[in-house]
Swiss-Prot record:
Keyword Cell cycle: no
Species in which this protein is naturally found: Zygosaccharomyces rouxii (strain ATCC 2623 / CBS 732 / NBRC 1130 / NCYC 568 / NRRL Y-229)
Covalent S-S links between cysteines: none
GO BP term (any one): lipid metabolic process
Superkingdom of origin: Eukaryota
Protein name: Altered inheritance of mitochondria protein 6
Molecular-function annotations in GO: phosphoric diester hydrolase activity
Gene: AIM6
Record key words, sorted: Signal
Amino acid sequence: MNGVKSWTVTLVFYFLILAVLIANLDGSSSLFGIIPKRANSSQKPPHLHLQQLGITGSRLLRFFQDNLLEFEGASSLPGDEQPGISLYYDSFKKYLYDAPHGPPRPLECNPDKSIVAKLTKDVQPIPVHSHNDYWRDLPLFQGIAHGAISTEADVWIYPKPTNADTPEDEYILAVGHNEVFLDPVHRTLDGLYTGPLADMLDQVNCVEGHKSGVFYDSPEDTLFFYIDFKSQETHLLYKLLMDKYLKPLMDKGYLTYFDLESKKLVWNQITVILTGDFPKDLGVIDNGENGYYNDNKRYAFQEANILEPTALEPNASVVSTSSLSNLLEKCGYNERSILSQGQMDNSLTKCIKSLISQSHEAGLRTRIWGVPNWPVSFATNLWHQQVENLGVDLLNVDNLDLAQSIF
């Protein structure tokens, strides 16, 4: 009998030791609530402490990329909750909105603790257009954090998701490059762009009569916001854009506009450019003669063509654009000829500069798209030539890190 008791005690002691070892190996919080978990000296600060990081811009992006999974609450979501855009995007946005473990806190007008301060304090605005911005890991935020003064969203008309609280016959504007891969739940124009822009501007425009944009150290700079029309129903798309997505920004005075009475352009925090298959008729743009909102103001500007800068009616545009291939053809060149030289020669730069100058004389800024981005040395040579020799106002850029490094 004593032998049985002895073996029983031995087995209990053996299993207890085994359980302690397993608990230490798998990181369990405790052993049946009896033996507390040993403190981990290498444990990173919780996600909540990120509110005091003090780093901004591209450094902030790299910090999140390198440390995302190290922070409490960032490596997993509660229950069955799934990432909306991605774990990276969702966690980054929660940091910006000062809400690491729950819904965003009510926005307060406090420039020093604003989203704008977290993103762009000590960031120099650069003459860059964030091409295909909606493809980036952090749409809108990534371009702004690098100082890009222009962004872009491709939009499609899409039926409301079945779980929405609105009638099924209404539509939303989904953001994406290809209609097949649209996500009308998470990737919408208001979710990715107009909503965050309104939140950012609300936090820094505290004093009436004082305008502040998305760049903390250059609050007077506007953000060019390209809306690329993808759906064939252009008039409906424009109506949705104006009625549902831009009106909240207009109501708060955040949109650049052309005064149809005084014939003056008034710059504000966001300048909307229509590109792609947008309506060409100003009667549609202005909804008649008194402006779309019947206030004698034009809030959306048609993209002009560098090769025909005066083809549109005066004051219909603020930016003209052309592909590099069209400019090369106009000047009697092709891409192969400049690739072999590694840059544009004097004759070509003189020709393109004359075209750029025509746009400038018409009061238009300029952007050239379709510029090769490889080899890297060739791409950077063309960037320098666009800015220094041609006078291009917006560089069309995919690689934001590389572009930021040359300014």
